[in-house]
């Protein structure tokens, strides 16, 4: 069986609220760390989310 190309990652809020999203990314084409602007419901604003490991 072949190794899967997509991996699950955790997007952690940079606002320090502890909120996170779980998403997938293609590890072969996106080798750098992912940063996305998404909505944080704790602070009720759009903030930057940075990639972290799923524990």
From Swiss-Prot:
One term under GO cellular component: cytosolic large ribosomal subunit
The keyword Ribosomal protein is annotated on this UniProt entry: yes
One GO term of the biological process aspect: translation
Keywords: Ribonucleoprotein, Ribosomal protein
One Gene Ontology term of the molecular function aspect: structural constituent of ribosome
PANTHER family: 54S RIBOSOMAL PROTEIN L39, MITOCHONDRIAL, LARGE RIBOSOMAL SUBUNIT PROTEIN BL33M
Assigned protein family: Belongs to the bacterial ribosomal protein bL33 family.
Entry protein name: Large ribosomal subunit protein bL33
């Amino acid at each position: 069986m072949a190794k899967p190309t997509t991996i699950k990652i955790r997007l952690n809020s940079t606002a320090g609220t502890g909120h996170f999203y779980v998403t997938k990314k293609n590890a072969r084409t996106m080798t750098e760390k992912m940063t996305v602007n998404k909505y944080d419901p704790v602070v009720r604003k759009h903030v930057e989310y940075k990639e972290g490991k799923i524990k």
